[in-house]
Swiss-Prot record:
GO terms for cellular component: cytoplasm. The RecF protein is involved in DNA metabolism; it is required for DNA replication and normal SOS inducibility. RecF binds preferentially to single-stranded, linear DNA. It also seems to bind ATP. HAMAP family: RecF. It comes from Streptococcus uberis (strain ATCC BAA-854 / 0140J). This is DNA replication and repair protein RecF. It is found in: Cytoplasm. Keywords: ATP-binding, Cytoplasm, DNA damage, DNA repair, DNA replication, DNA-binding, Nucleotide-binding, SOS response. GO terms for molecular function: ATP binding; single-stranded DNA binding. One of its GO terms (biological process) is DNA replication. Gene3D superfamilies: P-loop containing nucleotide triphosphate hydrolases, RecF/RecN/SMC, N-terminal domain. Belongs to the RecF family. ATP binds at residues 30-37. InterPro entries: DNA-binding_RecF, DNA-binding_RecF_CS, P-loop_NTPase, RecF/RecN/SMC_N, RecF_2.
């Protein structure tokens, strides 16, 4: 898939912008703080209805305005369509072909994106919540049912935690009902994640071995409080663990186990990647991003759109070649932000460049 045209209204430092893109490489050039990253953020926000930079939606709306609108014209394997996202103090409105979407799971995944930004290095050493978010974003785009299962799980989890916090005398029967629901939805979430991590490891290791000239292997593991593989046995083990931890949960007034506390770990040549070098970290994340692209194509039949936010200058000659070979050979529409073309050493002849200056966009 590729985005042919994008219209921005009141997004960050952009007032009104209408522009068309190349189905191949699109490069945004400009000094810092001019709006290059904002433009990639707009594409990301249109795809996922959330920003990768802030949790405060109000920050996305241009100063002194009270709403924003994004409209994208998308070409997919299945045909052309339009996406629209409106944001105001009343909330979000999402539309596909001008038809309002009632559920996020009906909208997310229509346009798939993979973002590669400098902060992705935090995936290795950062908090577990970052790695769970990484899984949720990928799976949410690939499998709409995952978003539904995750939403249901989070709803029951919130109910259970609220009950534990506010009720002085616990009704064991009612808590058992919540436990049953939590285990049902939670086991589905865990099963989705286990399957996905298995596929991700396969693809990421393939790319990592190529980047390291066969010297390194990459393994990704999913760490859960439940280790079984199929939905039913996961559910049974989940319920058993909830029962074992019930008194602890009542005392601490929260739910101590479940996919909301799970984590993933990375190993290079069987060594925890936390102890790897900075160069190895870059190779790992690059392998991960290329694996995301490969998996989305494999599991949906269509390419995602790749957003490279100020990362090319962080990659050496070998890594740049590997990344650009992948996106060019696989016909992946790619957006790159940079302050200069000088360190983009291996760009093909046919690229579309945009010069960004104080919220204005000029195509060459």
């Amino acid at each position: 898939m590729w985005i042919k045209e994008l219209q921005l209204r009141n997004f960050r430092n952009y007032g009104t912008v209408d522009t068309e893109f190349s189905p191949g490489l699109n490069v945004f050039i400009g000094n810092n703080a001019q709006g290059k990253t904002n433009f990639l953020e707009a594409i990301y926000f249109l795809a996922l209805t959330r920003s990768h930079r802030t949790r405060t939606d109000k920050e996305l709306i241009q100063f002194s305005k009270n709403n924003l609108q994004l409209i994208g014209k998308l070409n997919r394997i299945s045909g052309a369509l339009s996406l629209e996202l409106q944001l105001s103090d009343k909330g979000r409105i999402t539309k596909i072909n001008a038809l309002k979407q009632a559920r996020l799971s009906d909208y997310i995944g229509t346009m798939m994106v993979v973002l590669f930004a400098p902060e992705d290095l935090q995936l290795i050493k950062g908090a577990p919540s970052l790695r769970r978010k990484f899984i949720d974003i990928d799976l949410g785009q690939i499998k709409p049912i995952y978003l539904s299962d995750l939403s249901n799980y989070n709803y029951v989890l919130k109910q259970r935690n609220t009950y534990l916090k506010t009720i002085s005398t616990i009704n064991s029967d009612f808590l058992s009902v919540l436990d049953e629901q939590l285990a049902d939805y939670g086991s589905k979430v865990i099963k989705h994640r286990i399957d996905f991590i298995g596929e991700l490891t396969r693809e990421a290791n393939k790319h990592h071995e190529a980047i390291s000239n066969g010297l390194e292997s990459l393994i990704i593991t999913y760490e859960s409080s439940v280790t079984q593989q199929d939905h039913q046995t996961i559910k049974e083990a989940f319920l058993l663990n909830l029962q074992k931890n019930r008194q602890r949960d009542i005392f601490k007034k929260n739910t101590s186990i479940g996919p909301h506390r799970d984590d993933i770990h990375f190993f290079i040549n069987d060594m925890n990647a936390n102890f790897a070098s900075q160069g190895q970290h870059r190779s790992l994340i690059l392998s991960l991003k290329m694996a995301e692209v490969s998996l989305m194509k494999e599991m949906t039949g269509d390419n995602p759109i790749l957003l490279l936010d100020d990362v090319m200058s962080e990659l050496d000659n070998t890594r740049q070649i590997k990344l650009l070979e992948t996106v060019i050979n696989e016909n992946v529409q790619t957006f790159i932000t940079t302050t200069s073309l000088d360190h983009l050493l291996h760009l093909p002849d046919k690229i579309k460049t945009f010069h960004v200056n104080q919220g204005t966009l000029k195509a060459d």
